[in-house]
Amino acid sequence: MRHSNSGKKLGRTPSHRKALFRNMAKALLTYGKIRTTETKAKELRRIVEPLITLALRNDLHSRRLAYDVLGSHQLVKRLFDDIGPAFVGVSGGFTRVVKLGLPRKGDNAPLAVIELTHQPAAEAPAEEKKAAE
């Protein structure tokens, strides 16, 4: 019986799973969207959504809790200064999982894209300005 056993094991040890989701969370918060398997995307939501909720609280304790998960001061700064303000007034549903039509070549795994529903506004104009110069 699987009573009170939440989360998928994904055929990995607990330390491997922790490292996997830490790296995936870093990638999602850095790039805004990533392509992965459906199962990993759905499990990643359980890590990223509480991080964005911490960013909405925006106090020192929340920053320290986010650093525990992310392990990067630059990413914590980006989370609290850029990503968090984009979600002010939103009470949940910070990420979206979109299933892709074609499975992965090789092992036929179903693929999905996980993305942030609100992209930080400060990013895009700065990149376009750099490209124009």
Curated annotation (Swiss-Prot):
Q: What terms describe the molecular function in GO for this protein?
A: structural constituent of ribosome
Keyword Chloroplast in the entry? The reply is no
Similarity comment:
Belongs to the bacterial ribosomal protein bL17 family.
Q: Matching HAMAP family, A to Z?
A: Ribosomal_bL17
User: Pfam families given for it?
Assistant: Ribosomal_L17
Is Ribonucleoprotein a UniProt keyword of this protein?
yes
- Record keywords, A-Z: Ribonucleoprotein, Ribosomal protein
InterPro entries per record: Ribosomal_bL17, Ribosomal_bL17_sf
What is the name of the protein in this document?
A: Large ribosomal subunit protein bL17
Q: Which GO terms describe its cellular component?
A: cytosolic large ribosomal subunit
Disulphide bond pairs: none
Organism superkingdom: Bacteria
Biological process per Gene Ontology, one example term = translation
Spell out the subunit comment.
Answer: Part of the 50S ribosomal subunit. Contacts protein L32.
